[in-house]
C-alpha cells in the first residue's frame, strides 16, 4: 500500500473522474461537492463478492447520508463501461442493479494511489473509506484488507459525530450516537461528563 497524499486535517486530494451516475457517464470532481460532506469509498473490483454487498448497502442508505448534507462516492480501478455492465446485471446474478450513488472509474489508478489505498502488486484498491467535510478537509480514514466489508452504519455515525463537533464545539466519546452525551473539551467542564458516566 502506497502512502499517498491523503492526510487527516488537510485538504483532501482533488480529482476528476468519469463516473456512472443514474445509468449514464458523467465527469465528477471532488470540488463539485464543496459545501457538503463526502464519504469516498474505494473497493477492489467489479463483479466480485464482498464489493456488491458494500455498494448496495451504501446505495440503500444514500438518502440517509443526503439528509445529513453528505454525498457518497464509490471508486474502483475498473472502467466506467465495466461499472455500467455491473449495474445493468440483476442483483440475483451478482450484479448491482440500479444505484443511488455514483461509481467512479480509476483506470489510471491515480485516485487509489493519491489516497494511499493502491495494492501495487495487484493494481487494485484496498477497501479505503474517507470522510471529507464541507470545507474539503479530510476528517477520517479507514482501510480494510480485501476480505472484510465495511459498516455503512458506522460511516453514518462518524459523519454525524463530525458534524456535531463542528457545530457545537464539544467532542464525542467512544460509541457516541446522536442524542448521547458529549464532552466539553476542557479540564473543568469535562468533569460533568465523567461524573455521570463513571
Swiss-Prot record:
Concerning PROSITE patterns, the annotation shows: THIOREDOXIN_2
Task: Return the GO cellular component terms, semicolon-separated.
Answer: cytosol
Q: Which residues carry this modification: N-acetylalanine?
A: 2
Pfam families assigned to the protein according to its UniProt record, in alphabetical order: 1-cysPrx_C, AhpC-TSA
**Functional summary from the UniProt entry:** Thiol-specific peroxidase that catalyzes the reduction of hydrogen peroxide and organic hydroperoxides to water and alcohols, respectively. Plays a role in cell protection against oxidative stress by detoxifying peroxides and as sensor of hydrogen peroxide-mediated signaling events. Might participate in the signaling cascades of growth factors and tumor necrosis factor-alpha by regulating the intracellular concentrations of H(2)O(2).
In its miscellaneous comment, the UniProt entry states: The active site is a conserved redox-active cysteine residue, the peroxidatic cysteine (C(P)), which makes the nucleophilic attack on the peroxide substrate. The peroxide oxidizes the C(P)-SH to cysteine sulfenic acid (C(P)-SOH), which then reacts with another cysteine residue, the resolving cysteine (C(R)), to form a disulfide bridge. The disulfide is subsequently reduced by an appropriate electron donor to complete the catalytic cycle. In this typical 2-Cys peroxiredoxin, C(R) is provided by the other dimeric subunit to form an intersubunit disulfide.
- How is this protein organized at the quaternary level? Homodimer; disulfide-linked, upon oxidation. 5 homodimers assemble to form a ring-like decamer. Interacts with TIPIN.
Protein family? Belongs to the peroxiredoxin family. AhpC/Prx1 subfamily.
Q: What is this protein called?
A: Peroxiredoxin-2
Gene, per the UniProt record = PRDX2
Amino acid at each position: 500500500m502506497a502512502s499517498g497524499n491523503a492526510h487527516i486535517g488537510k485538504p483532501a486530494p482533488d480529482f476528476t473522474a468519469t463516473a456512472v451516475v443514474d445509468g449514464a457517464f458523467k465527469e465528477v470532481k471532488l470540488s463539485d461537492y464543496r459545501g457538503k460532506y463526502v464519504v469516498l469509498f474505494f473497493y477492489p473490483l467489479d463483479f466480485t463478492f464482498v464489493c456488491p454487498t458494500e455498494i448496495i448497502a451504501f446505495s440503500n442508505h444514500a438518502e440517509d447520508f443526503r439528509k445529513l448534507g453528505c454525498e457518497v462516492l464509490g471508486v474502483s480501478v475498473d472502467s466506467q463501461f465495466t461499472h455500467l455492465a455491473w449495474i445493468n446485471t440483476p442483483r440475483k446474478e451478482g450484479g448491482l442493479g440500479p444505484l443511488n450513488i455514483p461509481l467512479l472509474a480509476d483506470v489510471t489508478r491515480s485516485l487509489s494511489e493519491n489516497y494511499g489505498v493502491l495494492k501495487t502488486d495487484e493494481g487494485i484498491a484496498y477497501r479505503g473509506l474517507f470522510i471529507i467535510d464541507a470545507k474539503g478537509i479530510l476528517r477520517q480514514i479507514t482501510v480494510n484488507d480485501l476480505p472484510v466489508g465495511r459498516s455503512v452504519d458506522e460511516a453514518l455515525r462518524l459523519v454525524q459525530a463530525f458534524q456535531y463537533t463542528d457545530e457545537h464545539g464539544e467532542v464525542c466519546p467512544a460509541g457516541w450516537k446522536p442524542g448521547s452525551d458529549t464532552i466539553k473539551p476542557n479540564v473543568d467542564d469535562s468533569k460533568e461528563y465523567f461524573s455521570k458516566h463513571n
